[in-house]
A protein has these predicted regions:
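Intrinsic-disorder-linked linear interaction elements in eukaryotic regulatory proteins
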Residues: 1-222
Length: 222
């Protein structure tokens, strides 16, 4: 059904908004609007890719299909395959001169796959580049920049670089609370990451542990 709807929208020049709405049928239920996950998401991603693989590399729909395939592979723990798809997608985007925003999105997915594969240093390096890229593109108050900071600090904590993680989070959390609000999911995740970066540090002081507990208590209330 998604294949037919997208093709119809393109053929009749119904516009980007309509195409995007119909494209969503590939990855989300039209009734409840929840995203497909696991083997269902993977199966639809694979079907989507087979449907659109014959299009030129510069075709937007082909690029979306490739991203959907990579996400499906990653979610079902076919990590090496996901890595190959995402790396190929990034190479294509750079070759065809895609927008910086599009490239940063693919780099975010690739960094996540690096992390899942246990390549933490590579994940950190790419997340640092993504965070820097979003800051230049949108500024520190944009949601993409805040989410990139969250990913970056998660890798810093995983690599036991607690002081660096806390320093970035101390700068980022006030911005997130002001822009997104205290109840927003990304704000809560940033604060949780800060609490973790405090209490898992072997060098944590009593004041650090107290601040961590207080932060977690505040999050729980919210």
């Amino acid at each position: 059904q998604a294949k037919i709807l997208v093709a119809e929208a393109e053929e009749n020049n119904l516009g980007e908004k309509v195409i995007n709405e119909r494209w969503a049928r590939w990855y989300a239920c039209s009734l409840c609007e929840q995203r497909y996950h696991g083997v269902v998401g993977f199966a639809l991603g694979w079907a989507c890719w087979k449907t659109h693989v014959g299009r030129p590399e510069t075709d937007q729909v082909r690029g979306l299909a490739m991203r959907l395939l990579g996400s499906g592979l990653s979610e079902t723990d076919h990590l090496e395959d996901a890595f190959s798809v995402q790396e190929a997608e990034l190479s294509i985007l750079r070759r065809i001169g895609a927008s910086e925003h599009h490239i940063l999105g693919v780099q975010t997915n690739l960094a996540s796959t690096y992390y899942k594969l246990g390549h933490l240093e590579k994940a950190l390096s790419m997340e640092r580049d993504v965070y820097s890229g979003y800051l230049k593109l949108h500024g520190k108050e944009h949601e993409d920049s805040l989410r990139a900071a969250l990913n970056y600090t998660s890798s810093l904590v995983a690599l036991k670089r607690f002081e660096e993680a806390r320093a970035l989070l101390r700068k980022t959390i006030p911005v997130a609370r002001q822009v997104l609000g205290d109840n927003y999911e990304d704000t809560l995740k940033l604060r949780w990451s800060f609490a973790v970066a405090l209490y898992v540090d072997p060098a944590a002081t009593l004041d650090d542990l107290r601040e961590s507990v207080e932060t977690l208590a505040e999050i729980e209330v919210i």
